[in-house]
């Protein structure tokens, strides 16, 4: 009986993995599930430990770009002996400096081996004595790439338009860090 159950589970596993690999929205949810516990650490460009946790949900291209940007930032920090703040500060995976506290995946458009998913994000600040925290709500777009291991986050398009938030694309910001600290 155990043998039969094992066979059924082994046969069902590739089907479940295949279904998830074909769904960009599931990949976006997987990313935010992993990242939601990481951005609270206040890290700008994720360090090696956080990048290791994020690696399964990010594309090989974005993983490499994050590692290269982290190395460039470390070179700058060493060169100026920590006298200047990091080139990038705050949450680099969303438009808002503080990052999201909740997300909901919207529509995804898929074309060939790329997909774009809009994500409704919100940030609720911790309550302070006697005041009710007002949430910030915005939408960003995650760009995904189809890899042999399934859909992976390949870039973030900052769509919120906040006066002091991130604008453009995550990949462009990382390229700026890399170029400014060769």
Regions found by a protein language model. Give the residues of each.
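Bacterial N-terminal signal peptides that target proteins for export
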Residues: 1-7
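N-terminal signal peptide c-region/cleavage motif recognized by signal peptidases
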Residues: 12-16
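Extracytoplasmic/periplasmic, Sec-exported soluble proteins
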Residues: 20-24, 42, 46, 132, ...
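Core segments of small alpha/beta cavity-forming domains
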Residues: 20-84
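Surface-exposed, charged secondary-structure patches
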Residues: 58-131
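Hydrophobic/aromatic beta-strand elements that line small-molecule binding cavities or substrate pockets
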Residues: 105-107, 139-146
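Low-complexity, intrinsically disordered terminal/linker segments enriched in charged
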Residues: 114-118, 122-139, 147-148, 152-182
